[in-house]
């Protein structure tokens, strides 16, 4: 299937594992250039190796950038490095972070803050930067991945469902 993604720059947060990794494989298969962002350089290196081995002719179309996206300045640095590698971001896929599962009796204001920092603000810190550039160009797409816990809160995942 040709989704017209050849040579488009796709930045994927949380791209070294799980849903983000699966998205990276799919975008690479469509010919996109993919920047992966994750906290762990080790996980990023492993993902790049696995993707290069599984998706034909993709090694030169993968860039990796380690950053804790809970820190806005590190999100900005990761974006700058990704743009230096492949130019403006055409598609942003946010798949980073997860809220800690906490039983209701252990919830505290800090648990709620931690959950918002882990999932919500990691997205906001990258979206804020990218959407301005996309708006100035008049094009681009942003996909925010939300798991089942973000749609319907369970008793032990209330902050993640907020």
Regions found by a protein language model. Name each.
Residues 8, 88-89, 134-148:
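Active-site loop of short-chain dehydrogenase/reductase
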Residues 127-128:
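A short, exposed helix-loop element centered on a Lys and neighboring polar residues
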Residues 103-104, 111-116:
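Substrate-binding pocket helix/loop in short-chain dehydrogenase/reductase
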Residues 30-47:
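Conserved glycine-rich Rossmann-like NAD(P)H-binding loop of the short-chain dehydrogenase/reductase
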Residues 41-42, 66-77, 109:
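The beta1-alpha1 cofactor-binding region of Rossmann-like NAD(H)/NADP(H)-dependent oxidoreductases
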Residues 9, 16-18:
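Conserved glycine-rich cofactor-binding loop
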Residues 143-162:
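Catalytic loop of short-chain dehydrogenase/reductase
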């Amino acid at each position: 299937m040709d989704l017209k993604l050849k040579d488009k720059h796709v930045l994927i947060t949380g791209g070294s594992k799980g849903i983000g990794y699966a998205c990276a494989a799919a975008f690479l298969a469509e010919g996109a250039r993919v920047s992966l962002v994750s906290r762990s350089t080790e996980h990023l290196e492993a993902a790049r190796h696995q993707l290069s081995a599984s998706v034909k002719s993709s090694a030169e179309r993968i860039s990796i950038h380690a950053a804790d996206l809970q820190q806005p300045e590190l999100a900005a640095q990761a974006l700058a490095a990704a743009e230096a590698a492949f130019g403006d971001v055409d598609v942003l896929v946010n798949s980073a972070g997860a809220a800690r599962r906490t039983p209701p009796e252990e919830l505290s204001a800090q648990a709620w803050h931690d959950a918002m920092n882990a999932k919500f603000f990691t997205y906001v810190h990258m979206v804020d930067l990218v959407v301005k550039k996309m708006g100035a160009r008049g094009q681009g797409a942003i996909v925010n991945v939300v798991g089942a816990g973000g749609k319907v809160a369970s008793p032990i995942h209330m902050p993640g469902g907020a």
